[in-house]
Every structure is written in C-alpha cells, then in structure tokens.
Amino acid sequence: MKKEFYNIAKLVTQNSKILDVGCGNGELMKYITENISKDIRGIELSKSNIQKCVEKGLTVIEGNAEIDLKQFPDSSFDFVILSQTLQAFLDPENVLNELLRIGKKAIVSIPNFGHWKVRLHLLLKGTMPVTENLPNEWYNTPNLHMCTIK
C-alpha cells in the first residue's frame, strides 16, 4: 500500500463514519475497513475501479463528486477523504466546500508536481515523469490543475 495511505489512515479515528471521494481501486478503503472502521464507503467515477472495489467487498457509489456530493446531508460523515483527486476537478473550490459541508473533518492530499524528483526528471528528460502517483502521460491526463505544497 502507498505510504500516503498509511499517513491518511493514521488521521482517522476508530469506528468513525467515512466517505472516500474518488476512492480508486479501493486500496485505502480496504485498509481502513480491516484496521480502523467498518463504516466506510466510496464514491468513484471509473467503472473499472468500481468493479475492483466491489470485488474487494467494499461499498462504493458510482458518481461524479462535483455533482453528487450535493446529495449528502450536512455533517453526514466524521471524515471525508479526497486523495490525489483534487487536481482533476473543474471546480476544486466547490468540491472542497462540499467536503467541509458533508464531513466533520476533511483529509485532502494532492500530487506534488513541484517535488524535486519531478522537476529533475523534467529538466533531464524534458518530459513529465510517469510514476505510480502520476500514472498518465502529460497529454493524456485527467489533471486539470497542477499542485504544489507551497
């Protein structure tokens, strides 16, 4: 499992109610289910990732977070997790506002496009790197916004 997922899981309290927005293949959800809280569900756009979640026995809703988060009542969850997904939204500010509305606490992580390894790769090879965290070629990416820590 990605180190980032362990760091996120450490922030979640035992037996809390959790929504994982853009849950991907369910790797983080599965870890949380087995170790922290059984009351977790995800929302995911990709049909293939939804299938992977279902195969793992996870509860997942097919949906677009930019539209479908509005359907949840205020303070529905103790934690709302958005991992490596914010940069792919057309209106990230609206998504963040929805996370704060439906969750008592929001945990957000982003890919750091300014990381020294990314910049070094760009300098030496002239291309954006393709890695586990940045798995797409620059011309075929869902990332609409490039994020850095500062």
Regions picked out by a protein language model, each given a short descriptive name:
Residues 1-15:
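Conserved alpha-helix/loop element of class I SAM-dependent methyltransferases that forms part
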Residues 21:
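Conserved beta-strand/loop positions that form the S-adenosyl-L-methionine
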Residues 25:
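Conserved SAM/SAH-binding loop
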Residues 31-68:
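Class I SAM-dependent methyltransferase SAM/SAH-binding core
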Residues 68-74:
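Short conserved loop adjoining the S-adenosyl-L-methionine
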Residues 79-90:
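A short SAM/SAH-binding and catalytic strip from SAM-dependent methyltransferases
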Residues 93-101, 105-150:
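S-adenosyl-L-methionine-dependent methyltransferase catalytic module, highlighting the catalytic core
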